[in-house]
């Protein structure tokens, strides 16, 4: 699915924040970094799922390891829709070769 210009700008900003953070991360211990955290809020229908899917692809291109993404939402309906859209729905092509799993798996 194609992103709109404001969505591209948002996904690039998230990926750039990740890259910047990984260049100078916070540490829990000497060899244990605090994971990168990004919160995204926007009105319903703004394309948050698409923005984050695109950001994940950009982040994957920056790393030598497969990123692990914990995707949280307050609403059960939103969680179900997001799971479907990312695993085999309209956004699945935006994050190819990812294993999409519910948290309990």
Task: Please name every model-derived segment.
Residues 1-105:
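RecA-like P-loop NTPase motor core of helicase/translocase proteins
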């Amino acid at each position: 699915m194609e992103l709109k210009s404001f969505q591209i700008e948002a996904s690039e900003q998230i990926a750039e924040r990740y890259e910047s953070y990984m260049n100078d991360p916070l540490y829990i211990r000497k060899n244990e970094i605090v994971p990168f955290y990004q919160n995204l809020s926007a009105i319903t229908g703004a394309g948050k799922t698409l923005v984050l899917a695109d950001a994940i692809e950009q982040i994957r291109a920056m790393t030598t390891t497969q990123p692990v993404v914990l995707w949280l939402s307050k609403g059960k309906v939103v969680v179900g829709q997001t799971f479907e859209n990312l695993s085999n729905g309209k956004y699945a092509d935006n994050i190819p070769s990812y294993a999409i799993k519910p948290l309990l798996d």
